[in-house]
Amino acid sequence: MIFSLNRVIDSLAGLLSEEYPDYPVYDSPNQQGTSFPCFFLFFMPSTIEEHVGNRYFRDLGVDIIFVQQRNLVNGNQKIHEIAEFLDRNLDPFPYTDGSGENVPVPVYDQQWNIEDEELHYQFHIRTRIMVKETENLMQD
């Protein structure tokens, strides 16, 4: 199975869209045309450690942001509902590389807070990956 940043975004977007099909999921800031309520998926600072034999340990920070119209009556109620959904369903989340096979990926250090009437649900994905060596076909 291939582990990639784009597929992490796609897998998380799939989880959110399954529960909230009417809420668009964006992976980059939209200046115009954003439809509320919606989710944004961003990577936070992440680290990669090199290990033996083309293996790497990757620690990806992820921030799922839920945005709705400002100053809604009972606006925090929806934020709390989504935070509870993520608490229950995110660990582990079903990761797919597009081949049709799902692999459960655990998450770590889950935390959420409300900033400026937006939910920030943050967590880490810690995984070991192996990069295939490329053979140099050039000969002297």
Q: Which residue stretches match the model-derived regions?
A:
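A short, hydrophobic beta-strand-centered structural micro-motif
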Residues: S35-M44
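Short acidic low-complexity segments
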Residues: Y26-S35
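Charged, amphipathic alpha-helical segments and their flanking helix caps
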Residues: M1-Y26, T47-D140
